[in-house]
């Protein structure tokens, strides 16, 4: 598999995971009692402030999905200009790599079991899309 196709596959995997996270966050925002798997896992039903934060996070994760797809070479809209795609995707890679460590350190067994592997695969997928994907000079 050449790097262009690998980048497209990595961007697609990352986007799929991001959309899954967005759906999870949207469900939390709507009141689904999955709080034990989010925001530190301290309570099943999260409060109003965290529900609002989950709603905002859902929107952000949709943007991250679009960025991953575009950086992977797909012809789709992204919330950043093409010249910023690679740096943005590298930044998102670092952010999700930090998320791996934070989820691994969580006191919530549910967060550790669910989000540690999810963020690990997401970080690797974003990293591959960033490294092998669209170049600013070729966009």
Where are these regions (language model features)?
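Juxtamembrane helix-break-helix junctions at the cytosolic face
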Residues: 2-4, 66-84, 107
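Membrane-water interface at the C-terminal end of transmembrane alpha helices
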Residues: 122-139
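Membrane-helix boundary connector in multi-pass membrane proteins
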Residues: 100-115, 134
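Non-cytosolic membrane-interface motifs at loop->transmembrane helix junctions
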Residues: 40-47, 80-82, 108-119
């Amino acid at each position: 598999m050449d790097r262009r196709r690998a980048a497209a596959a990595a961007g697609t995997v990352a986007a799929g995971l991001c959309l899954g996270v967005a759906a999870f966050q949207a469900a939390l925002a709507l009141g689904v009692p999955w709080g034990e798997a989010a925001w530190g896992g301290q309570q099943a039903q999260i409060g109003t402030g965290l529900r609002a934060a989950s709603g905002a996070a859902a929107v952000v994760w949709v943007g991250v999905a679009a960025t991953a797809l575009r950086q992977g070479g797909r012809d789709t809209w992204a919330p950043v200009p093409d010249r910023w795609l690679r740096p943005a995707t590298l930044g998102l890679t670092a952010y999700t790599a930090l998320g791996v460590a934070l989820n691994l350190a969580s006191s919530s067994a549910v967060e550790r079991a669910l989000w540690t592997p999810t963020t690990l695969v997401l970080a690797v997928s974003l990293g591959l899309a960033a490294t092998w994907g669209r170049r600013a000079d070729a966009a």
